[in-house]
Swiss-Prot record:
Residues 1-36 form the signal peptide. The keyword Metal-binding applies. Residues 54-176, 708-766 are annotated as: Disordered. GO terms for molecular function: inulosucrase activity; levansucrase activity; metal ion binding. The active site is at D272, E524. Substrate binds at W271, S340, R424, D425, E522, I523, E524, R542. This is Inulosucrase. It is an enzyme of class 2 (transferase). It is found in: Secreted, Cell wall. Ca(2+) 2 binds at D419, Q450, W487, N489, D521. Its EC number is 2.4.1.9. The gene is inuJ. Optimum temperature is 55 degrees Celsius. Activity drastically decreases at 60 degrees Celsius. Residues 65-75, 82-95, 140-167 have a biased composition (Basic and acidic residues).
Length: 797
């Protein structure tokens, strides 16, 4: 009995020892394998290759850009970074979700901007042009997505190898396409190995139209657009808008008045504005000792767009002295709105107004029409008061002819939500013979219409053949750029009016003065000024209305805004315009769009007695309180622009008070000048603005939500993007679902065979993992046997 009992003890001890050994081995091997999988996930994330979408072909360097290499990139690659972040989704995007690039750095941090976009050799552009941009994981890929990422990497690698093979060797059963005519020479001259072109690429190249005749006036080309963006990024002092002293900017006192829509006294904003001018010289008219200005005004954060008459003593530079005569078209007109235009005096002292009548009844699609009306005024001189007596002859002058200019019906037939409609901003000008014209913003008609075919118009590109080829493949390889290019057809149009001054109609319709097919869908607020024997045409534009995502995203990232004024010059009013400064750039943004000193809607006014200078007026673009609660859109300080005889321009360091429309000896006020220094007394930024991210949902629209409100406004979304130390932020700054495990693994687990959490399990198919599972299973069986034996012994004892 004793020997038998000892034998059982020895046998039991051996089983227990074997069980413990196997269990320990399984646990150690499982843990090390899981840890290896986790490390592997980190390595995949850190070394993930970032595919580059090229927009230029000037650089012959063939290196691939990886996430690791990006640390060595210069600021010239800034557009590439923006495009990689946003365009890689390769989906059709709207204005809301494409404007997502933010700036957290001062403008002065921009150092090297030799190019707007990352440049790639022609052969690399060609080989990648027909592929969708990658959706591969970047450094923020979650560890539990590693299997999917690796699977995709494997597929991408296989596809890349197949594409490489197919680009070199034609398919056995397919006929190799051939380049034809002029495009063949261009491709070969650009250094592309034609044997590596796919049939699809060759077919796309063969569609290119090399016609050299412009169909719709002078063209703003794709190359011009890139140059304008590059100039903005570089902050060239000849074109950068001067800095204003942010502490001196204030809301317009005269903007507190009866609102046209509500009929109540409201604190209104004011934006697009224009003086009553002599239609021939462009000088501000002197109406009975007063200067008159018409401006768009409305309640913040409301779709409220109407025009008001403002007045001040002629030559008075004091911003506080402006008064408001009220809305020109009266009260209670929410459906019919009035947008920008121009105005001149009639011989009887009445104002002939040209404006944009906007019908919003069709689902707020803003049906725009050029209109005219005669405005009669009352003057109570002893009370220093001007009022609107009555308005006559209010009628539609022009809303497109379908051929030169797109009509509303044409637009509505094809609009899918990505197409802008434009028939607005009529500017009046008389030629030397007394003929009257309107220059206006529009879209091209069937003469040179929007559509896919514009992508194949070589004339739209405007660079060297090599540059154009790279841009061509850039457009084809990016779905958002391609879609924008298809719809882009902005134009600056011109019509001649008949001799009925107070009730004008169209006498002749001309081809556009400027057009931007494939390049931009919005060039607005045209302004023509005659200086000496030349006509100078200016217009404002937002680059994010253009097709080249890489370019405008680069400006957003570098400066924080993408607005500009472009300019052209001609010996003739109705045709023959050439761009100023080679690309057309005249003014570029210099501060982020949500700073108190950001501006837009630039309007050039002649300086009396000078044929080489213009006074540039604009408004502070704080619509919807984007710069902070209570900071409204208001008139900006004006500044001088020098016009040089060689068709170049230079911004001068001459600045006025806010709302100065007449430059004279008393106009200059150096106190309004600012600097780009964070803590300077005359800084261009208010406290808290330096480094503040730009929320592009708030910029450039007509229904804007408040930005960082102190007190919530009823019925208006109040989600500040970067709250200033909130007690209870509406949007948590930490993720709702933490990236760390909710139940952390204990430092000293009591149960040595506790199941590993799912996020740390090894990958399926791993040999070590399989061995660990087998060992774990064996140990579990032996453990069960051992525990059973123990239980039996306890019961027997």
């Amino acid at each position: 009995m004793l020997e038998n009992k000892n034998h059982k003890k020895i046998s039991l001890s051996g089983k227990s020892l074997l069980m413990g050994t196997l269990s320990t081995a399984a646990i150690v091997l499982s843990a090390s394998t899981a840890n290896a999988a986790t490390i592997n996930a980190d390595n995949v994330n850190e070394n993930q290759t970032v595919e580059v979408t090229a927009s230029s072909v000037n650089n012959e360097n063939n290196k691939q850009v990886t996430e690791k290499d990006s640390a060595d990139k210069s600021t010239s690659d800034v557009a590439e970074d923006a495009n990689t972040k946003k365009s890689n989704e390769n989906t059709e995007t709207t204005e809301k979700n494409t404007q997502t690039v933010v700036t957290n750095a001062p403008v002065s941090d921009v150092k090297n901007t030799n190019t707007v976009t990352a440049e790639t050799p022609v052969d690399k552009v060609v080989n990648n042009s027909d592929q969708k941009t990658t959706n591969a994981a970047t450094t923020d890929t979650k560890k539990d997505d590693v299997k999917q990422v690796e699977k995709k990497d494997s597929v991408d690698k296989t596809n890349a190898e197949e594409n490489k093979d197919s680009s070199v060797k034609p398919a056995e059963n397919a006929t190799k396409a051939e380049l034809k005519g002029q495009v063949k020479d261009i491709v070969e001259e650009s250094g592309v190995d034609t044997s590596k072109l796919t049939n699809d690429q060759i077919n796309e190249l063969n569609k290119i139209n090399f016609s050299k005749e412009a169909k719709s006036g002078t063209q703003l080309t794709y190359n011009d657009f890139k140059k304008i963006a590059k100039t903005l990024i570089e902050q060239d002092a000849r074109y950068a808008i001067p800095f204003f002293n942010a502490s001196k900017i204030k809301n317009m006192p005269a903007a507190k008045t009866l609102d046209a829509q509500s009929g109540k006294v409201e604190d209104l904003e004011i934006w697009d504005s224009w003086p009553v001018q002599d239609a021939k010289t462009g000088y501000v008219s002197n109406w009975n000792g007063y200067q008159l200005v018409i401006g768009m005004m409305g309640v913040p954060n409301v779709n409220d767009n109407h025009i008001y008459l403002l007045y001040n003593k002629y030559g008075d530079n004091d911003f506080n002295h402006w008064k408001n005569a009220g809305p020109i078209f009266g009260l209670g007109t929410p459906v019919i709105q009035q947008w920008s235009g121009s105005a001149t005096l009639n011989k009887d002292g009445s104002i002939q107004l040209y404006y944009t009548k906007v019908d919003t009844s069709d689902n707020n699609t803003n049906h725009q029409k050029l209109a005219s009306a005669t405005v009669y005024l009352n003057l109570e001189k002893d009370q220093d008061k001007i009022s609107i007596a009555h308005v006559d002859n209010d009628h539609i002058v022009f809303e497109g002819d379908g051929y030169h200019y797109q009509t509303y019906d044409q637009w509505k037939e094809t609009n899918k939500g990505a197409d802008n409609i434009a028939m607005r901003d009529a500017h009046v000008i008389d030629d030397d013979n007394g003929n009257r014209y309107l220059v206006f913003e529009a879209s091209t008609g069937t003469e040179n219409y929007q559509g896919d075919d514009q992508i194949y118009q070589w004339l739209n590109y405007g660079g060297t053949n090599k540059d154009n080829l790279g841009d061509f493949f850039q457009i084809l390889s990016n779905s958002d750029i391609k879609d924008r290019a298809k719809w882009s057809n902005a134009a600056i149009g011109i019509i001649k009016l008949n001799d009925d001054v107070k009730n004008p109609s169209v006498a002749k319709v001309y081809s556009p003065l400027i057009s931007a097919p494939m390049v931009s869908d919005e060039i607005e607020r045209p302004d023509v000024v005659k200086l000496g024997n030349k006509y100078y045409l200016f217009a404002a534009t937002r680059l994010n209305r253009g097709s080249n995502d890489d370019a405008w995203m680069a400006t957003n990232k570098a400066v924080g805004d993408n607005v500009a004024m472009i300019g052209y010059v001609s010996d003739n009013l109705t045709h023959g315009y050439v761009p100023l400064n080679e690309s057309g750039v005249v003014l570029t943004a210099s501060v982020p769009a949500n700073w108190r000193t950001a501006t837009y809607s630039y309007y050039a006014v002649p300086v009396e007695g000078r044929d080489d200078q213009l006074l540039i007026t604009s408004y502070i673009t704080n619509r919807g309180e984007v710069a902070g609660k209570g900071m409204h859109a208001t008139w900006a300080p004006s500044f001088l622009l020098q016009i040089n005889p060689d068709n170049t321009t230079t911004v001068l360091a001459k600045m006025t008070n806010q709302g100065d429309w007449i430059w004279d000896d008393s106009s200059e006020n150096p106190d309004m000048m600012g600097v780009l220094e964070k803590d300077a007394p005359n800084s261009a930024a208010l406290p808290g603005e330096w480094g503040k991210p730009v929320d592009w949902d708030l910029i450039g629209g007509y229904n804007l939500k408040p930005h960082q409100p102190v007190t919530p406004i009823p019925n208006v979304p109040t989600t500040p993007e970067t709250p200033t130390t909130p007690d209870k932020p509406e949007v948590p700054t930490t993720p709702e679902v933490p990236t760390t495990p909710e139940t952390p693994t204990p430092e000293a687990p009591k149960n040595p065979v506790k199941k590993t959490s799912q996020s740390k399990l090894p990958k399926a198919g791993d040999k070590n993992s399989f061995a660990a599972v087998v060992l774990g299973a064996v140990s579990s069986i032996l453990g069960a046997v051992g525990l059973t034996g123990v239980s039996k012994r306890k019961r027997n004892n």
